[in-house]
Every structure is written in structure tokens, then in C-alpha cells.
Amino acid sequence: MTVLEYVAMLAALVLVPWLAARRLAEPVDGSDPRAAFEAARARHARRALLRRADASALPVLTTSRRPARTVACVVPLREIVGSVDRGPHPFDRRFDPSADTAWARFAAVLRARNDGVELPPVLLHQGCDGYYVLDGHHRVAVARALGDTETRAEVAVDPSPCA
């Protein structure tokens, strides 16, 4: 193996994944809803290729209990880890859109944010390993795509979330 071949192999093994990982962390520009949606979809596809696994699975919390009250708070987006069992969602575990079915609502939420509309807080359920979305999947997706670090939320209070 020549030095040039060795350097090329090293670049493919180290540099390319490093550059891809940096690109995965970049927030999208919110001025064009279609471009923002496509950038988030592309980020989902790159992440799936890098992991060589199905990155489309959004963790689901199965619960039959519906807490009676909620508490208003600000929640770090990194602590939102999945969805409460309400059917399939067109997002991966980082809330990047994994299907075109998310486009219309994603665009509507992004336009509302760009127009200065105050969106309602997301409704979350606290589990043992983080928060699960009851309502507001598209708001979480747009917030993450734009690089926000936290979001306003109503957290469903459960006296024993890990029981």
C-alpha cells in the first residue's frame, strides 16, 4: 500500500464521518420552509447511512394512564426522546422528518414561527429516560431543525413515571 493510498483510506475512515457528523449538527435556515424541510430530511438520510441502521424509529412510550394535571416549564430539546403511543410518526429519533407526509404541517409551523406567531407549548409526558411528546411533534421538529436548544412545554405530571 502506498502512502497516498493509506492517506486516502485514513481520510475515508476518519475525515468523512467527522465532516458528516459536523454537518448533522448544523441548524437549517428557516426562511424557506421547503429548503428547511429538505435539509432536515437530508440530515435524517445521512444519519441513517452513518449508523447503517434504521434511524427512522421514534421511541414510543406505551402508557394507558393520562395524568390529570400539567406543569408549565421549559424543557431542553435534547431531553425529548420519543412519542407517546399515538400511531406512526414521520420523524426519526432526533425529530428530523423521515417521510414526506410531515411536509405540510412542518411548513405551516415554520411559517408561523417566521411570522412571529406565538405557538402553543408542546405537551409532554415524563418517562424514566426523558420526555415523550403527546402533542407537538412538528413544533419539536421545527425547533430542532432551526437549532433551538429548548422549548416551552406543558409536562404531564405522573407521580411515579418509572413504576
Which residues does each PLM region occupy?
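Short, charged/polar connector segments at secondary-structure boundaries
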Residues: 5-148
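Contiguous mid-protein beta-loop-alpha structural module that forms a pocket-lining wall or clamp
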Residues: 147-150, 155
